[in-house]
Amino acid sequence: MARRCEVCNKGVSHGHNVSHAENKTKRTWSPNVQTVRAVVDGRVKRITVCTRCLRSGKVQRAI
């Protein structure tokens, strides 16, 4: 599953783990995306959506 929201296009962000000695190693932050059944253009479709879009009501979930 792609770690990208199909509504807001939020994806993986990159950065560093920083130790107390200021050593840096690469790491990634993944968005909290979930596969939900949603109404898209009047039809029920399975899409990948981040939880922020779910909470803000940008997606109408199918029953």
Swiss-Prot record:
Specify whether Cell inner membrane is a keyword of the entry: no
Q: Name one GO cellular component term.
A: ribonucleoprotein complex
- Which InterPro entries does the record match to this protein? Bacterial_rp_bL28, Ribosomal_bL28, Ribosomal_bL28/bL31-like_sf, Ribosomal_bL28_bact-type, Ribosomal_bL28_sf
Q: Which cysteines are joined by disulfide bonds?
A: none
GO BP field: translation
Cite a single GO MF annotation. Answer: structural constituent of ribosome
Q: Which SUPFAM superfamilies match?
A: L28p-like
Keywords noted in UniProt: Ribonucleoprotein, Ribosomal protein
Task: Please tell me whether the keyword Cytoplasm is annotated for this protein.
Answer: no
Q: Which family does it belong to?
A: Belongs to the bacterial ribosomal protein bL28 family.
Annotated protein name in UniProt: Large ribosomal subunit protein bL28
Give the originating organism.
Symbiobacterium thermophilum (strain DSM 24528 / JCM 14929 / IAM 14863 / T)
Please name the gene that encodes this protein.
Answer: rpmB
